[in-house]
Each structure stands twice: as C-alpha cells, then as structure tokens.
Amino acid sequence: MQMADLEKKLENSVLPPLLKRELSEKILREEISEEYLVDEIISETTRAYERTLVEPGEAVGVVAAQSIGEPGTQMTMRTFHYAGVAELNVTLGLPRMIEIVDARKEPSTPTMTIYLNDEFKGNREKAATVAKNIESTNVESVSEDISVDLVNECITIILNNQQLESRGLTVPDVIDAIKSKMKLKIEDHENVLNLKIKTPSLKALRKRLPKVRAIHLKGVQNIKRVIIRKEVDEYILYSEGSNIKEVFDIEGVDTTKTTTNNIVEIQDVLGIEAARNAIIYEMDATLGNQGLTVDKRHLMMVADLMCTDGVVKPIGRHGIGGEKASVLARAAFEETVKHLYSASMRGYVDELGGVVENIIVGKPISMGTGCIDICIDKSYEEGKEL
C-alpha cells in the first residue's frame, strides 16, 4: 500500500493532520498491505481518538484548575539543585510554578541549557572554548583588587594575570574597554592600572568605583557563570543567567536545541508559539521534578489562555483575571470595590454570558446540561405526528 492510498483513506477522517501522518508512516513502516487490516487500524484509531475528546459542555477550566492546583499543594517551598548540576541553584517547586503563571519578566534564578553543534559537542576543549566565549567577564572578575588610592588621587586596579590568561584577555584589552566606557586618564604599570579623573575628589572617585568594576570586557551580558557537563556522549553547557539572543550568535551553539527558563525572553526572541511551548514544558518539568504527574492537556489549557492575545500574560488581576469582559467576573476575582465603582461610573452593562456572573446572580450556568436550550412547541398535541 502506498502513501497516496493511505492519504485517500484518511481524507475524510476526523483525525488531526499530525495524527494522520504518523498513522500513515507507522502502517508503511510495519509493511501492512492487507486492506481490511488497514481499515480496522484506522477505525480503531478513530474510536480511540474520539474517546479522548472532551464532552460538549464540560467545565474544562475548572477541571484544569483543580488538576494543577491539587498536586501544587504537595509541592515543596524550597529551592533545589538543578537536575544533576550541583553547582547551580535553580528555583523549583511551588515558587517556580508561581513564577511561570505570573509571567515574571525575570525569573529569580535565570538559567540556560546550551547545546553544542556536532563539531563542538564531543570535544571538551572545544566545549570549554565556547563556554569562555559565553561567560561574562568584567573588570572585577580579572582583578585582584580595585580600590581608591587617596595619596595619588586615583582608582587603582591590580590585575590578575592568571585570570586574564584563562579568559583569553590582555592588559591592553582591559585598558581599551575602560576607555570606551569612561573618560579617564590611565597609567599602565604592567599589571597595575591607575585611573585618574580631571577634578579628583574622594566623592568623585568613590562614585566611579562601582562603574569601573562592572565594565564589560568579554562574553555575553548577564551570563555570570557557565558549567560544562558530559551527558551520555555529548558536552552540554549550563549557565547562571540568561541572554538567549546573544548566546545564539556565539559560534558552536546549536540554536535549534538551546533553551532558557525565562519565558518572556523566549517570547521576545523566538515568538509567542515558542513561549507557549516553554510554558507547557516548564510547568511539566517543575511538577515532574516533584514526582507529580498532570495530564499535559491541562497545562496546554493554561498556556493557551496565557498566550491567546499574542503576548504572554499573567494569570491574575494584572493579566487575564483583570481583563475579563464581564464586570461581575472581574469583581469576583480581586479588587471588588474598584471594579464595581469603575463600572457604575461608566454605566457598563453585564450580558451575563459567563459562568461566574451567572452564579453571582443565581442563574443556571451554560455548562453541562445548562448549555442546552429546550424548545417547546405549544401547538403540539399528544398523538399528533411531528
């Protein structure tokens, strides 16, 4: 049986396109040629698919909420080490779950999992070179001491030659970086730099000291540390800090697999669809790390709701909860007086189209049997044919 024959058989099937393709490939791979067997497989697959569909009128939102919320009560409040990487602390458990649904712009412990291209992933030295190019280096990280010299009225930097060499930098590189950021006169005494300003004073020198320490020399901004680990037959980099846009520009990085736990950053760089997938993955991984299993469709429901407007929105009064069309639904969530006061000032009308507002006014909700309207023919007589 050919692919074209299978496509014709599945043409009017209710199965989604992806499932149709996978089923066709499986039948061809197993070399099933008998037509009655193929028909039976398609029929059984269709029945199994239809059993997985939600019944009309099912309260999927409530089911999703309780399915995620109940395991959430069993989650720990502590921060654990990231899977297998003892040197990096990453927020897990309930705090991480709250971060995800709140759509925080910056996670409390941003981290990246950086995969390498075929040329780099099997060689530790090449992986270390990529790690050096990614790890952010500032003046403070290559210095033994940075202090204010009151006698000579300058800022003195004592450079660490070993650190400079390990990071592939030289003294002129440091001088050029400082000059590009600040207007200073620099005196070079081998590994000691004296930074002088036009009108020196203790206050002026102390004001410049933190800025000098933070001057960026090399690597990707915000990536404080990079750790190399061998997993199975390849080296993978784990970073403390996240900057996916700049990391993608580093030679040797596999941009198709590299990821970050910063969902808003994924949205900005890769788009809303990637952010949606990241929300599902992060929630599933956070629950799985605690030994909890939740059907992915509940997580997909939350992710779809957060991403439905094209940007990642938090589930709360500053996001989805505070933007509901119904005044009563908004008032029922949080900030009740504020919403009712605002609605009365503007003369809003609530159409009572949702669940919450109908419960508030005591009307049947449009779910389950309530989603059906029954019509009665008043002219109907018993025994009369319809």
Swiss-Prot record:
Main location class: cytoplasm
Gene Ontology terms: biological process: DNA-templated transcription
The keyword Chaperone appears for this protein: no
GO MF annotations in UniProt: DNA binding; DNA-directed RNA polymerase activity
A GO cellular-component term linked to this record: cytoplasm
Keywords of this entry: Cytoplasm, DNA-binding, DNA-directed RNA polymerase, Nucleotidyltransferase, Transcription, Transferase
CDD domains: RNAP_A
EC number(s) per entry: 2.7.7.6
Subcellular location(s) per record: Cytoplasm
SUPFAM superfamilies assigned to the protein according to its UniProt record, in alphabetical order: beta and beta-prime subunits of DNA dependent RNA-polymerase (SSF64484)
This protein's record includes keyword Cytoplasm: yes
Reactions listed under catalytic activity: RNA(n) + a ribonucleoside 5'-triphosphate = RNA(n+1) + diphosphate
Matching HAMAP family: RNApol_arch_Rpo1C (MF_00411)
Entry similarity comment: Belongs to the RNA polymerase beta' chain family.
Annotated function: DNA-dependent RNA polymerase (RNAP) catalyzes the transcription of DNA into RNA using the four ribonucleoside triphosphates as substrates. Forms part of the jaw domain.
UniProt subunit comment: Part of the RNA polymerase complex.
Protein name: DNA-directed RNA polymerase subunit Rpo1C
Name of the gene: rpo1C
